[in-house]
Amino acid sequence: MDPILLLKALILGIVEGLTEFLPISSTGHLILAGDLLNFNDDRGKLFEIVIQSGAILAVVWEYRERLLKVARGAFSEPAAQKFILNLFVAFLPLAILGLAFGRAIKAHLFNPVTVASTFILGAFVILWAERREHKIRIQTVDEMSMLDALKLGIAQAFALIPGTSRSGATIIGGLLFGLSRKAATEFSFFLAIPTLIVATFYQLYKERALLNADDLAMWAVGFVAAFVSAFLCVRWLLRYISTHDFTAFAWYRIAFGIVVLATWQFGWVQWAAD
């Protein structure tokens, strides 16, 4: 396979891994990177779907002991059953609204103005959330009730709007609903597993006609790059939030929103839904 194509796969895999679990939206970054690398055709979009699974696996690997414990106790331990039920409840809002409005959102909201506006608006939400008084009532994920899970699921549903950031919506939603930084961040990671797995398989099924065995090497490079970078990013974020808030990500979102508007206004990037 073309070494240049493999290099593009490596770069995009790293971009996916570094942005998937930070509150900065992976979608906007992949669009920009894909266009700069001239890899934004249907083949490139399918590639983005494939490498998402690498990022998912990174979270599964990081929390493998916890997840195995939950799996073993799924039919016998109340704590494990509560954890699974909370994830299911939190997953439902995005799944239902995505099926109902996904096509309309892609057709009408996937444009540079919406993406940039959402980036910037999301930044101000983060700044506001960080400046308000935090009343923490939930220190760990295990303390969450089904209602808490539903609230975070509703927050995650805002990620259907391009540029919102799934992780950003759930983490900041968690802070607003009284979760500690660690609990909000970890639940966002756990919720990513069913959410991204279902989204990945659904998109792969829709685009199955584009699947080609000749692209296996490219997918493998991107998958590994996404896995490694996402794993390192998850580890880093857990350390970062122990001593920092999310304000820096807000300022980054504002800067990136301005970049999106500039690239669109001057025609530097082909911001298109299809």
Swiss-Prot record:
Enzyme Commission number: 3.6.1.27
Catalytic activity: di-trans,octa-cis-undecaprenyl diphosphate + H2O = di-trans,octa-cis-undecaprenyl phosphate + phosphate + H(+)
GO BP term, example: response to antibiotic
Gene Ontology cellular component annotations, sorted alphabetically: plasma membrane
Keyword Oxidoreductase: no
Single GO MF annotation: undecaprenyl-diphosphatase activity
Record's miscellaneous remark: Bacitracin is thought to be involved in the inhibition of peptidoglycan synthesis by sequestering undecaprenyl diphosphate, thereby reducing the pool of lipid carrier available.
Protein name: Undecaprenyl-diphosphatase
Organism: Dechloromonas aromatica (strain RCB)
